[in-house]
A protein has these predicted regions:
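Soluble "head" domains of membrane/secretory-pathway proteins
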Residues: 2-30, 37-45, 53, 57, ...
Length: 252
């Protein structure tokens, strides 16, 4: 066996080992990302347009399972409240226990005397003015919730006289919405609003969904790349072998 042949065989064995490692690592990342996502996230279909334009009617969203104590102002949450309806609902948290809420002087939602910028509203001034909220204090352990489509949302403003100032218990929260999964033209992560960041407690950090997506995509690339190595290497080997045979035949 010539030195060139031994070198080629060595390269082939090393390539096969690396290919196997790539496929194995890719499977771990790909499956791990999916399993991690299934544990952390729950898909929901939003039946109404009360969260438009952020989330449209019929949109499929991905919501991270969290405890109610983790909720911050600005979060879009999935919750169940029997006095509001039988199905899970999706609204934005604008006030937490101890907050003083009112709306809408100068067309602005006010929390603890601070005007809140709400760039997610479709009609800034009009939407806010349409939502009249008398000065209301949120009881401890409870949340004040509004839809982004203020003129067409059955939220805390529709339940101000129901008791607890129209608020919902933190324990009613099932998950926090991180992304829109469907339709494709709306696909993507939801931005955390900055308007509440200056208030005590700030806003929540994004969930691990982005890392999960990176793990799944990276795993898929490694699996496909590793699986493709074998056929590519064999084809290259045949070409080298054919070239070597021609050179040997030409010597004489």
């Amino acid at each position: 066996m010539s030195r060139t042949q031994r070198t080629n065989e060595g390269r082939g064995r090393l390539g096969s080992v690396l290919s196997g490692i790539a496929v194995a690592l890719g499977c771990v990342l790909f499956l791990g990302g999916f399993v991690w996502g299934a544990i952390q996230y729950q898909p929901y279909t939003v039946p109404t347009g009360s969260m438009a334009p952020t989330i449209g009617s019929g949109d499929r969203v991905l919501a991270q399972r969290i405890d109610g104590d983790e909720v911050r102002r600005g979060d879009i949450v999935v919750f169940e409240q029997s006095t509001w309806g039988d199905l899970p609902m999706v609204k934005r948290v604008v006030g937490i226990g101890g907050d003083r809420i009112s709306c809408c002087q100068d067309g602005k939602l006010t929390v603890n005397g601070k005007d809140i910028a709400e760039p997610y509203l479709l009609d800034q001034g009009e939407a806010a003015v349409a939502t009249r909220i008398p000065a209301t204090t949120v009881p401890e352990g409870r949340l004040f919730l509004l839809g982004d489509e203020r003129s067409g949302s059955l939220d805390s403003t529709a339940h101000l006289t129901d008791g607890e100032n129209g608020t919902v218990s933190r324990k009613a929260v099932k998950a926090r919405v991180d992304a829109v999964a469907w339709p494709m033209e709306r696909f993507g992560m939801l931005e955390r609003p900055d308007g509440f960041s200056a208030l005590p407690g700030g806003t929540s950090e994004p969930g691990p969904l982005r890392l999960m997506a990176i793990a799944v995509v990276a795993g898929m690339v490694l699996v496909l790349g590793g699986a493709a190595y074998g056929p590519v290497a064999r084809r290259a080997g045949r070409r080298r072998a054919g070239s070597g045979t021609q050179e040997t035949a030409g010597v004489g």
